[in-house]
Amino acid sequence: MTVLAVTGTDTGVGKTVTTAALACAARLARRDVAVCKPVQTGTIDGDDDLGEVRRLSGVTALHGGWRYPEPLAPVAAAGRAGAPLPTRTELVGSVRAVDAAGRLTIVEGAGGLLVALGADGVTLRDLAHDLGAQVLIVVSPGLGTLNHTALTLEALAAHGLSCAGLVIGAWPAEPGVAELDNRTALEALAPVRAVLPAGAGAASPERFEALSAAAFDADWITSLS
């Protein structure tokens, strides 16, 4: 079982685009890859993270789970919809049902590392622990990112979990001093596995495939086990 969890330091940092780019790069590296999004909110506004992953990455082994209409944190969204939340056991089981020998299963969280996903307060950190998964952190290049990233790394280390690296999810076309300095500082915190350009999610599938292949090191993807 090879499970890689993807979290972000904030909303809007590019988790879904990063998930799609990683899945695309893994497909190009000839890995058997699946993407799992156990909890999705905001479906009333047309949010469909797995649909976006499919469109951009060309990966078809996609597995959803619990979906809630309003664009809120999962517990709030479920409460307002009058819908049940999954338990920790159900969430872990949903990912294990997707994984297979030799497969890389990418699990995209909802919100950040410690956002409650289930009825019992289970978080993506808990799922990573139960699944023996490393965690890839998607970060912003802007001000505040160093503190947010350090806090997320500390939260992983406190539970003995391994960080697979960082991805800068939306690198500006014209970075300023803050972005350039932050990029150097982020590289000192953890390996930066990829830097994706801002607006990458609007690219055509062909263009997205090219930028995904260029962004991620195929040897690193192959080594994930």
From Swiss-Prot:
<feature type="active site">
    <location>
        <position position="37"/>
    </location>
</feature>
<dbReference type="GO" id="GO:0005829">
    <property type="term" value="C:cytosol"/>
</dbReference>
<comment type="pathway">
    <text>Cofactor biosynthesis; biotin biosynthesis; biotin from 7,8-diaminononanoate: step 1/2.</text>
</comment>
<keyword id="KW-0963">Cytoplasm</keyword>
<keyword id="KW-0067">ATP-binding</keyword>
<feature type="binding site">
    <location>
        <begin position="12"/>
        <end position="17"/>
    </location>
    <ligand>
        <name>ATP</name>
    </ligand>
</feature>
<comment type="subunit">
    <text>Homodimer.</text>
</comment>
<feature type="binding site">
    <location>
        <begin position="108"/>
        <end position="111"/>
    </location>
    <ligand>
        <name>ATP</name>
    </ligand>
</feature>
<protein>
    <recommendedName>
        <fullName>ATP-dependent dethiobiotin synthetase BioD</fullName>
        <ecNumber>6.3.3.3</ecNumber>
    </recommendedName>
</protein>
<dbReference type="GO" id="GO:0000287">
    <property type="term" value="F:magnesium ion binding"/>
</dbReference>
<dbReference type="GO" id="GO:0004141">
    <property type="term" value="F:dethiobiotin synthase activity"/>
</dbReference>
<feature type="binding site">
    <location>
        <position position="108"/>
    </location>
    <ligand>
        <name>Mg(2+)</name>
    </ligand>
</feature>
<keyword id="KW-0436">Ligase</keyword>
<feature type="binding site">
    <location>
        <begin position="197"/>
        <end position="199"/>
    </location>
    <ligand>
        <name>ATP</name>
    </ligand>
</feature>
<feature type="binding site">
    <location>
        <position position="49"/>
    </location>
    <ligand>
        <name>Mg(2+)</name>
    </ligand>
</feature>
<comment type="similarity">
    <text>Belongs to the dethiobiotin synthetase family.</text>
</comment>
<feature type="binding site">
    <location>
        <position position="49"/>
    </location>
    <ligand>
        <name>ATP</name>
    </ligand>
</feature>
<feature type="binding site">
    <location>
        <position position="16"/>
    </location>
    <ligand>
        <name>Mg(2+)</name>
    </ligand>
</feature>
<feature type="binding site">
    <location>
        <position position="41"/>
    </location>
    <ligand>
        <name>substrate</name>
    </ligand>
</feature>
<keyword id="KW-0479">Metal-binding</keyword>
<dbReference type="GO" id="GO:0009102">
    <property type="term" value="P:biotin biosynthetic process"/>
</dbReference>
<keyword id="KW-0093">Biotin biosynthesis</keyword>
<comment type="function">
    <text>Catalyzes a mechanistically unusual reaction, the ATP-dependent insertion of CO2 between the N7 and N8 nitrogen atoms of 7,8-diaminopelargonic acid (DAPA, also called 7,8-diammoniononanoate) to form a ureido ring.</text>
</comment>
<keyword id="KW-0547">Nucleotide-binding</keyword>
<dbReference type="InterPro" id="IPR027417">
    <property type="entry name" value="P-loop_NTPase"/>
</dbReference>
<dbReference type="InterPro" id="IPR004472">
    <property type="entry name" value="DTB_synth_BioD"/>
</dbReference>
<dbReference type="GO" id="GO:0005524">
    <property type="term" value="F:ATP binding"/>
</dbReference>
<dbReference type="Pfam" id="PF13500">
    <property type="entry name" value="AAA_26"/>
</dbReference>
<keyword id="KW-0460">Magnesium</keyword>
